[in-house]
């Protein structure tokens, strides 16, 4: 659970800190499965590409989350989140949604699903 609790802060810090980026990557298993608005990707290298894409498209971002809770009857955890940011174009945005995660036997994040309120949020990362 410690890795889940560190995730959002490290994600935001990773935009300007290579050390935070390495710590962020260390939260995940090498074979991470992540789902962005219904589009599944696999592997830590694809995860790193996604994070870099977010930072290329956004000049600044800040996440808030309510707290990870176990999903009854499953091995998953979830939390509602909100993010505000400034795109590279200069426009500002807000977004809400939820993340669903699983941890492996070592406590690393092995599955992460991002379910944004805006279904177009990750259109640029479908391919």
Cite the ranges covered by each PLM segment.
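Short, mixed-charge, low-aromatic patches
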Residues: 1-11, 35-38, 54-59, 80-81, ...
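Short acidic-aromatic low-complexity motifs
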Residues: 1-27
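A generic structural signal for ordered secondary structure
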Residues: 5, 32, 48, 95-97
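Generic surface-pattern signal
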Residues: 9-16, 29, 52, 56, ...
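A solvent-exposed, acidic/Ser-Thr-rich amphipathic alpha-helical stretch
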Residues: 21-25, 29-75
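A beta-strand edge to alpha-helix "cap/lid" segment located at domain peripheries
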Residues: 55-127
